[in-house]
Amino acid sequence: MLKNFKNFTLEDMKAKRLELKKEYLDLRFKSVVGHVENPLKKREIRRDIARLNTMICEYKLGIRKV
């Protein structure tokens, strides 16, 4: 699943990152306590968070214009 975050503003990126972090934390707890329906979802969310972190860092360094 390829996400397109390029059209997001900086505030949207930060909000989406926070949302994904909460979702990832919930999935981690579910995997420890019980059964997770889609175990690959954790990996997808983790990679999306990394993509957003990279884009936010690029914005701060002036590489990317939002």
Swiss-Prot record:
The keyword Cell inner membrane does not apply. One of its GO terms (molecular function) is structural constituent of ribosome. One of its GO terms (biological process) is translation. Keywords: Ribonucleoprotein, Ribosomal protein. One of its GO terms (cellular component) is ribosome. Belongs to the universal ribosomal protein uL29 family. HAMAP family: Ribosomal_uL29. This is Large ribosomal subunit protein uL29.
